[in-house]
Every structure is written in structure tokens, then in C-alpha cells.
């Protein structure tokens, strides 16, 4: 039975699927514009995608921009994500830099949730998870497959591996090559929901997989990602359209 996670009065893992909006910007001016544009959008969680910054190689600059986001959205749960190139992100970096950055963000206590890539070395991942939780930050462990959809059993196994590493939220995103692949992801989500003790987040990417972003409440995915001003992953739906569709599915259409 999945237990929920409460972050700034937002309940993750129970009730309606929560909408996260990625904040994508190259510099301070773009970030300011993005924050202005999304402030009245119907989202639940802000995800700061720091890997898109031109200054992504500077921990100090990233901390500065994260503070800007925190100040602009004081009441929204803030998910900090630094997606590396190998998992579909914009910045290639070493494990050493990656974990130094995560440590700095954790110790700043600016984010409420921090994204940690599962396949970054088990010892380092477990240490980062423990450090986050010690500082009152929820650890979201994640994995991304940009070229295929693994079998159902493998998807469930990876989500279980995240939970075994201490994750507060377990996330996997896969790329479908067919409609059957989308069904595989949804079936895996349903199975993982039955087994998991922590909230799970799943999605099938691209246009073919877009339906998975709308079906979380039925199959068990706790968060869906919708674009605010710019997509951060293939197949994201605009936040306003996403909210309207989720409302329609939840309340029923006449």
C-alpha cells in the first residue's frame, strides 16, 4: 500500500494526480520571464531544470538561480532537477561534479524535493538520498529510457530498486515504439502501485505516449509533467490543457 508524501500542503501519492511544470531558462533574464509567465498557471509543483542554464558548470550560479525560483514561488513545492546528458539532459558532467552540485543544493535547503539519477553508482546515490532526508528534502530517484520501453517486469524492478535505495518518490520515463509499449508502461505502473510503499511517477514519452500523462490517477502515477513555456521532455502537454483534461476525467463529462 502506497504511503503519501506531503510537501508544502501538497499531497503526493493520494488523490488527484499533481501537475509539475518544468522551469526552463538559459539565464537570469529568461528565468525571470518564465516565472512571470507561469505564476498564474494551474500547477502544483515547480521543477527547476538547472541543466538548461548557460552557467550549468557553476555551482554558485545555480544556487543563485535556485534562490530566485524559491523567492518567486514560496508556497509551491520546488523540485530541483539537474538532468545529465546520458539521461536526456542538456549538460554532460562527471559524477564528481554531479554529486557536489546535489550536495550544495541539499545543504542550501532551497528545494523541497531533489531529483537523483538512479544509475549513478549505488553508494553515491544512497549517500545523496540520506543527506537529502537528513536536511528535510524529499529524494526523487529517477531513470529515463529515451530509445525503448523495457518489459513490464524490468520497469517494476527499477521502481522497486529506487525504493530499496531509500527514495521518497520513484520515477521512470520510457520511450514507446508502439501503442503496445504504452500499455506495457501503464500495466507496469498498476503493478508497481500495488507493490510500492512510496509514491511512483511514470510516463511514456513522445506523442504516442501522451495518453500516459493523463492516466495517472487510474493507473497509479502520482505526478504528471506539463509544459509551461517550453517542453523539457518529448510529449509534454501544456499545463492549462493538462489541468482541464484531468479535471474532465476526474469529474466526468456530460
Curated annotation (Swiss-Prot):
GO biological process, one term: amino acid biosynthetic process
CDD domains (alphabetical): DHQase_I
Top-level EC class: lyase
Key word Secreted present: no
Cross-referenced InterPro entries: Aldolase_TIM, DHquinase_I, Type-I_3-dehydroquinase
Binding site for 3-dehydroquinate: 47-49, 83, 213, 232, 236
Pathway it works in: Metabolic intermediate biosynthesis; chorismate biosynthesis; chorismate from D-erythrose 4-phosphate and phosphoenolpyruvate: step 3/7
Keywords assigned by UniProt, alphabetized: Amino-acid biosynthesis, Aromatic amino acid biosynthesis, Lyase, Schiff base
Annotated active site: 144, 171
Role, per record: Involved in the third step of the chorismate pathway, which leads to the biosynthesis of aromatic amino acids. Catalyzes the cis-dehydration of 3-dehydroquinate (DHQ) and introduces the first double bond of the aromatic ring to yield 3-dehydroshikimate.
Subunit structure and binding partners: Homodimer.
Family the UniProt entry places it in: Belongs to the type-I 3-dehydroquinase family.
Listed name of the protein: 3-dehydroquinate dehydratase
Amino acid at each position: 500500500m502506497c504511503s503519501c508524501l506531503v510537501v508544502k500542503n501538497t499531497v503526493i501519492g493520494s488523490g488527484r494526480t499533481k501537475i509539475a511544470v518544468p522551469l526552463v531558462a538559459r539565464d537570469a533574464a529568461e528565468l525571470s520571464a518564465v516565472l512571470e509567465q507561469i505564476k498564474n498557471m494551474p500547477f502544483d509543483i515547480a521543477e527547476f531544470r538547472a541543466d538548461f542554464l548557460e552557467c550549468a558548470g557553476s555551482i554558485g550560479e545555480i544556487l543563485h538561480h535556485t534562490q530566485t525560483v524559491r523567492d518567486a514561488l514560496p508556497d509551491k513545492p520546488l523540485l530541483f532537477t539537474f538532468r545529465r546528458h546520458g539521461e536526456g539532459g542538456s549538460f554532460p558532467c562527471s559524477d564528481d561534479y554531479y554529486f557536489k552540485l546535489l550536495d550544495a543544493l541539499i545543504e542550501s535547503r532551497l528545494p523541497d524535493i531533489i531529483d537523483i539519477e538512479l544509475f549513478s553508482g549505488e553508494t553515491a546515490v544512497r549517500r545523496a538520498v540520506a543527506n537529502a532526508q537528513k536536511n528535510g528534502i524529499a529524494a526523487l530517484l529517477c531513470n529515463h529510457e529515451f530509445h525503448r520501453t523495457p518489459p513490464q517486469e524490468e520497469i517494476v524492478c527499477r521502481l522497486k530498486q529506487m525504493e530499496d535505495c531509500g527514495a521518497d518518490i520513484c520515477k521512470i520515463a520510457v520511450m514507446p515504439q508502439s501503442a503496445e509499449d504504452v500499455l506495457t508502461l501503464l500495466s507496469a505502473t498498476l503493478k508497481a502501485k500495488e507493490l510500492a510503499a512510496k509514491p511512483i511517477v511514470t510516463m511514456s514519452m513522445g506523442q504516442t505516449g501522451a495518453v500516459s500523462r493523463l492516466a495517472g490517477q487510474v493507473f497509479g502515477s502520482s505526478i504528471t509533467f506539463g509544459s509551461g513555456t517550453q517542453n523539457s521532455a518529448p510529449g509534454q502537454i501544456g499545463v492549462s490543457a493538462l489541468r482541464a483534461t484531468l479535471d474532465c476525467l476526474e469529474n466526468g463529462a456530460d
